[in-house]
Amino acid sequence: MASPSSFTYYCPPSSSPVWSEPLYSLRPEHARERLQDDSVETVTSIEQAKVEEKIQEVFSSYKFNHLVPRLVLQREKHFHYLKRGLRQLTDAYECLDASRPWLCYWILHSLELLDEPIPQIVATDVCQFLELCQSPEGGFGGGPGQYPHLAPTYAAVNALCIIGTEEAYDIINREKLLQYLYSLKQPDGSFLMHVGGEVDVRSAYCAASVASLTNIITPDLFEGTAEWIARCQNWEGGIGGVPGMEAHGGYTFCGLAALVILKRERSLNLKSLLQWVTSRQMRFEGGFQGRCNKLVDGCYSFWQAGLLPLLHRALHAQGDPALSMSHWMFHQQALQEYILMCCQCPAGGLLDKPGKSRDFYHTCYCLSGLSIAQHFGSGAMLHDVVLGVPENALQPTHPVYNIGPDKVIQATTYFLQKPVPGFEELKDETSAEPATD
């Protein structure tokens, strides 16, 4: 995990001030931010115009129905939606049979952001289920008896760290997990997602995340990884899945977060990356797109906005005098407005954009992005601003791991008390060698 500095990620819960300014998206001049296609229609411009029209309807309806606009996060409805999902899912989720640890993580993290306690019986049931997903070869599969894969391994470790009990921590077979990571490591520093699978930046991040949380990083496990990730940064400034590919929000987050863990952020052109990610916030909608010329999507409220705390800290460490000491480098108010007005399902749960269905994935990442937009800095530089009613305030999330900062500290403290698997044996063997003249 990255070493602490004067600018840290930990934002303790506080009495957050409430935004008193008029809503950004309800200003009379806001319509000027809509797409101007210069009378040259394309497939993408037509789709963008359709989305903007739907969002304009939401903005107009809100303005018409609220004489004094006060945005409200429907906490109770979201809580009940999440609570039901932990116990029972409809057959619509059959397609996610290989993503069951993800469902645990998405729901548990959403609950911790809402500051909803996880009952002990539920925590125990989740632990027992995830133990069934752990492979004898190391790592976790998408369900009991499935092949291990780095994506559900990341989700399972995060879920267990959110639960944060000794019972949860001890489910993770650290020795086998380290062996599994070595089996995926490639000569160029990259990692396979699973044995015989594809290589991309996600796997490097998932490996770095679980290894750093559980204290199994060895001197050579990530040899060459930072250099490989740096080759994935392209001319746009963002990061693609592999070298030479188009920059994408999800891959960019994974790449930068992995480098933060490895303390190699300076391997990237940070100013170019900053320009790319800030250009992904949509002028009219207020949310983020994942790639250039794509539509807004609520999940990028985290994948893109979550990059800004990482960049802020990296640039702060370089002594950049232009950095704000009270706000991230994106329009925090506009993002909060998009999530609260456009991404909440009336029945509970959050979604991609108006017209889309709710799901646990978007619920998790919309709430994560909302938390990022509410909380800035820590200590003397703590500056929290919550849009709408005070009850909208969420718990902070760690932008590297996307679980509570306190859960990161708790997990790393626990696992740092244990030796890195194999390291002590190697040290003992070395010390047992006879001295030479």
Swiss-Prot record:
Cofactor(s) the protein requires to work: Zn(2+)
SUPFAM superfamilies linked: Terpenoid cyclases/Protein prenyltransferases
Complexes and interactors: Heterodimer of FNTA and FNTB.
UniProt key word Zinc: yes
Gene: FNTB
Biological classification of the source: Eukaryota, Metazoa, Chordata, Craniata, Vertebrata
Protein name (Swiss-Prot/TrEMBL): Protein farnesyltransferase subunit beta
Binding site for (2E,6E)-farnesyl diphosphate: H248, G249, G250, Y251, R291, C292, N293, K294, Y300, S301, F302, W303
GO terms, biological process: lipid metabolic process; positive regulation of cell cycle; positive regulation of cell population proliferation; protein farnesylation; regulation of microtubule-based movement
